[in-house]
Structure formats: C-alpha cells, structure tokens
C-alpha cells in the first residue's frame, strides 16, 4: 500500500482561547484529488497553513516529506484578477530560472498561447483560472493546493477547470488538494472528500455519499444539500 504524501494525526491548533481545529486526522494520497469542504470558520484555512508549515500544531503530528514541493494558490489571488501585467510576464516573475522550458510544457495542455500577451485584468473568469493553474504548477510541484478555485465560475467553466486539473495530475503526476464550497461539483470530480467543522465530520470517497448515509447526513447537518447527487446528469 502506497504511503500517503501528507498525514495529519490527531492534530489540534489553538490560537489563544480559540480552537479552530480539534483532533483532526486524515491522509492525502499521491496523485489523488482530495477536496476539503466545510462552512465558514470550519478551520479550512488553518489546515492549509499547517500543511504549508506557516503554523505549528498545538498537539498531534503532521507527517510530510520535507522534500515535497508544494504549489499554492490562495483564495485572495483567485478573487483579484486586476493586475496590470501580461500573462507571460506574470508567469515569468514566478519562475524566472526555468520559465521557457516550463511554459512550453504548461502550454501543451493549458493552452495559454492566445492569451499570453493579454493583461491579467482583461481576462474572463475561465481564462483567469487557467492562469491560476499555470501559476500553481510553473515550479514543478509534487502537490498543488487550490483555495476556492471555483468561485465566480459558471458551471461550464468549472467543468473545464476540472478537466484541466485531471490532465495536469496525469501528465505531471501531481497530487491536488482543494478547498471548495461547491459540493455537487466536488462529488463528481474528487477521489476523496473531507468534511471539516473544527473536527472531521466525515470523509471518504464520493460514491459513499449516498442518501441517508452517515456521510450524507453529516453534510446535510452543515447545510450542504446532497439530495441532487442522486439525479443523473
């Protein structure tokens, strides 16, 4: 059995008197798409900061290979596409040393050629998310963390985004860890779903989210509407 690339073991984190996450355990498997969902204030940002080494756990253990290269796109970046700089120049700033080689490979499946000379501020939502993905992989990471990448995208753009993510992980052998509020899209496109509300309410593979299952009931209790998962689309 393959060793997970990240493992949280009974992790808790306190900030003063606040305990945003309590006794959290989960694993992230190599080359999977793992999605973390939960309401506002559930501790999702704290999980990401712990993954990135920006915070240390108050108790518990986080097992992560120190050589693991992580590409991270924060939520705020995804919501502020107003930079007065071209796509090509922006990517070059992120990875100047190996830019030419990497951008050719990225271009082969993300297809930035027709927008590379456009200013970021002029891009559509779908085009901007392509740039977000390119930013996350331009330095050849083993794992990419995407914080709410589907916000402000229509259904068609969301599906195109997931198609790109699948292509990227297969071509580059990259693991994907995502935070999302869009449960229905998550269920269709993730290998593993983790539901967080300060602690792990439920986790598993999408086909375990069946009506009246423990997983489905936990999601419903947090306000996630799961019934429409039964319908054929």
Swiss-Prot record:
Gene3D superfamilies attached to this UniProt entry: P-loop containing nucleotide triphosphate hydrolases
GO biological process assignments: response to zinc ion
Swiss-Prot/TrEMBL catalytic activity: Zn(2+)(out) + ATP(in) + H2O(in) = Zn(2+)(in) + ADP(in) + phosphate(in) + H(+)(in)
Record-listed ATP binding positions: 38-45
Gene Ontology terms, MF aspect: ABC-type zinc transporter activity; ATP binding; ATP hydrolysis activity
Functional note: Part of the ABC transporter complex ZnuABC involved in zinc import. Responsible for energy coupling to the transport system.
Family to which the UniProt record says this protein belongs: Belongs to the ABC transporter superfamily. Zinc importer (TC 3.A.1.15.5) family.
UniProt protein name: Zinc import ATP-binding protein ZnuC
